[in-house]
Every structure is written in C-alpha cells, then in structure tokens.
C-alpha cells in the first residue's frame, strides 16, 4: 500500500486496462523494499511461488493478456487477478534483471517524474525504459503484456553454436503461432562466463561461450526452459553451484517439460533425486506439489515408498517435534516435509504420533 503512493496515486493509469501499472509495480516494490530492509525474510525466494501461480493460470487456453480492453465494470473487476499481480510483477522483475537494476531504476524514476499528478498508458512506461536502456523495450515488453500465455524455450548445443527455439507453452501439450521477444540471461556453468541474448524469432543460432549453458541466470524469467537429455545431465554436475532461485527454476522447468513430453521421466527423476537434501521451504512446496500430481496420476504404493525415502534425509535433520529454537522458515519446512511423509509413506508409527498430538 505504501508503494501505491507512487504507483497509482502520484501517477495513475488512464483507464482500467492499465491497472497492472499500479498493482504489478506495487507487488514488485513490496518485495524490493522488504528485501532491502529485512533480508532475513528472503522475500525474493517467495516470489518463486507467486510466479508459479502465474504460470498455472497462464498455461491454460482460457488465459488472458495482462492488459486488455475494458468496457464494463465486470471486466474491470476481472483485472484484479493472478495475471495482473503475479505475472505482472515477475515480468517487471525479468526486465529489471535483463536491462540492469540501475537502468531499470532510472527509467522508472523518469516515468514517475515526467508523469507525476498525471494519467498514463503502458506505452509511457515502455518509452521511459527504452530511453534508459540499450534495448527497444517499447517493442519487447508489449509481447508479454498484450498477449496471453508465455513461451517455453528449447536449448540445443550445435557444434560451436547455441540453438534456442520458442513455442507457446500450454499445459495440455498443444501450442499456437504466438511469438515473444524473449530476454535471456545465460550463465555458462563450465566457463563461468555470462551473456545476454534476445530471442525474437521461432528459432535462432547464437555464439556460445561454454558447453554447459544455464538459461535464465538468476531464475527470474517468465518462461520455461527445456534442456536436451545430455544438457540436463551436464547441468546436474554443477547442481551445487546454482543458487536457490536457479534450483527452483530448474526443477519447475523440467517438471513442466515432462508434462508436455519434452523430456523423459527417467531424466526428470534423476534430477529430482538431487533435491532430497535441499533446505528451502519454497523448493519443498514445489516438490510437494509435484509428488501430489504424480500420485494422482499413478497412485501406487511403490511411488509412496519412493516419496517416503525422498523425505527421510530432511526428516532426520529437522525432526518431527516443534522446537522453540527453530526459525520461522525451519518450522514451515518441517511442516511441509512431515506432511508429505505422513501422507505417502504409510509409516503408521509416525502418523500415530501426530494423531496423539491432535487428540
């Protein structure tokens, strides 16, 4: 609400189709300000779950653009949803990391100063971000705001080149001819080099600076990445070098790739096994959702046994009993892991412990 003093009050959208200028910015700024003041809350990590909510809605054929023409009060109310808030804020974060924090700040400052006590269209923001950076944001950003959905980017190594291809991601496996101007941050895990690319066509060839590219350096892009089997195995060798957000995105992207048959179940399960020792509650929230979906598709006791074994290492560290010395994050993590183990492992002694507590 404090952020709305600038985004919504000082500068106000001209019409309801631009409500994302208020709400997406407020959602982003609350994280930026809180992270600067209370870094121990790790709110950037929380944005992973917000983006996942946006993915879930935007992967459906019934999705809508972040910005669309509003003609009735009912349509105005429809704007206040996960696409305006969660997708809008993470798209802004994606462009902040692509053009650079200082360039992004400069563009936003100029936007607020130029249009203070006035009303704006989205194009006014895009033009200021274009002026502040080396990229034509006024051509790139509309592909994310004016059309529904988002892409999945396929990655291939071809001799000395890197081939990137895009298609629209839909959870039912279908697609259409939508294209995005995709800002891509790449980190080469083997050479430690980084570079930025802009994928504007269905498929493009780029020069590569290493053999093990991790797409979406930092983990903030609003698209999925599908790696070849060979690349996924190579990236797995550098798993410990990825930060929390990158690990989250690697698992989420691979899970979504599996769901539309772009990677094999064997490759996905090999990757998933690397996460059993992770201590981030958001990663475990993602893992819990994955196992829940798997079990709905294949409700077999062998899968339940696998899930139980997956949880064991973390349970041994966390324990099942509440501790006053635990941090908030550790308490939340214990709740997630214990709940997952209790639901699928068929460990009666473990479950009876919690039944006794309840009674």
Per-segment meaning from a language model:
Residues 13-16, 26-28, 36, 74, ...:
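Flexible loop/turn segments at secondary-structure boundaries
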Residues 1-48, 337:
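Zinc-dependent metallopeptidase catalytic helix centered on the HExxH motif
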Residues 3, 41, 55-57, 66-73, ...:
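Non-catalytic accessory/interaction domains
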Residues 21-24, 50, 59-61, 86-87, ...:
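Short, solvent-exposed loop/turn segments at the edges of secondary structure
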Residues 48-49, 108-111:
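Short linear capping/connector segments at secondary-structure termini
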